[in-house]
Curated annotation (Swiss-Prot):
Top-rank lineage group of the source organism: Eukaryota
Gene name of this polypeptide: STY-11
Protein's name in the database: Tyrosine-protein phosphatase 11
Top-level EC class: hydrolase
GO MF annotation list: cadherin binding; protein tyrosine phosphatase activity
Residues given in the record as substrate binding sites: 81
InterPro entries assigned: Prot-tyrosine_phosphatase-like (IPR029021), PTP_cat (IPR000242), RTP_Phos/Ushers (IPR050713)
Organism expressing this protein natively: Styela plicata
Record family assignment: Belongs to the protein-tyrosine phosphatase family.
Length: 114
């Protein structure tokens, strides 16, 4: 979260599940619900979660001192447990959705994290 704050990141793209074949592959770094979590001196609160058939969009409010920002996570949720998707159709739809969503944003925001 410090990197997200320091680089003024507004969008996170996640392509994997947190667990694959029973092994942890990615830390669950975001809150499970609207209860805030604290990472160092940064507070993270999920403000919305839209679960779609192939991806989930989460919005977070992150606070550092008296400053607050909004961060969005695009989580592609149908990547198979092992290997690659059988077709690229849903992944291409996901990429197009993400691009449409973030293309109109202000140019003064930081890099998207994948």
């Amino acid at each position: 979260w410090r990197m997200i704050w320091e680089h003024n990141t507004r969008n996170i793209i996640m392509l994997t599940q947190t667990v694959e074949k029973g092994k942890i592959k990615c830390d669950h770094y975001w809150p499970f619900d609207n209860e805030p979590i604290v990472s160092g001196d940064i507070t993270i609160q999920m403000t919305s979660e839209s679960m779609l058939p192939e991806w989930t969009i989460r919005e977070f409010k992150i606070t550092h001192g008296a400053n607050t920002r909004r961060v969005r996570q695009f989580h592609y949720t149908v990547w198979p447990d092992h290997g690659v998707p059988e077709t690229t159709e849903t992944l291409v739809k996901f990429i197009r959705y993400v691009r449409r969503t973030i293309d109109g944003e202000a140019k003064h925001t930081g890099p998207t994290i994948v």
